[in-house]
UniProtKB/Swiss-Prot annotation:
Tissue note: Expressed and produced in a hematopoietic center that floats freely in the coelomic fluid before being stored in a particular hemocyte type: the granulocyte type 1.
Positions with a binding annotation for Fe cation 2: E59, H75, H79, H108, D113
GO biological process: response to cadmium ion
Organism listed in the record: Hediste diversicolor (Sandworm)
Annotated transmembrane regions: none
Molecular function terms, GO-annotated: iron ion binding
Protein name (database record): Hemerythrin
Record CDD domains: Hemerythrin (cd12107)
Family: Belongs to the hemerythrin family.
Keyword annotations from UniProtKB, A to Z: Cadmium, Cadmium resistance, Iron, Metal-binding
Superkingdom assignment: Eukaryota
Length: 120
């Protein structure tokens, strides 16, 4: 069982990791998934892939630089697996895959990213 998926699907303060850059990037991913719901096309899918890949690179760089986040390899693998899924999609994206992306992001932030709060 995962965390509750917000409706409407948007970032709120319950998703704060308290690193401004990462919170802003999480908002961008929420917005990209929301945009895909409203306009299921190749441009919105590309935007989702791009903002997600950029965020993962930034987050992983912060984790490595901190030297105090002990779950880096597992965290990075989750990023790689999610990117593989969304990079493998074509437009229009099936609704079950949009739902998967929504659920994955919520559960990843609250279940995994929250583990680095105060450590980066």
């Amino acid at each position: 069982m995962g965390f509750e998926i917000p409706e409407p699907y948007k970032w709120d303060e319950s998703f704060q990791v308290f690193y401004e850059k990462l919170d802003e990037e999480h908002k961008q991913i929420f917005n990209a998934i929301f945009a895909l719901c409203g306009g299921n096309n190749a441009d919105n899918l590309k935007s989702l892939v791009d903002v997600t890949a950029n965020h993962f690179a930034d987050e992983e760089a912060m984790m490595k630089a901190s030297g105090s986040y002990g779950d880096f390899d597992s965290h990075k693998k989750k990023h790689e697996d999610f990117l593989a899924v969304i990079r493998g999609l074509g437009a229009p994206v099936p609704q079950d895959k949009i739902n998967y992306a929504k659920e994955w992001l919520v559960n990843h932030i609250k279940g995994t990213d929250f583990g680095y709060k105060g450590k980066l």
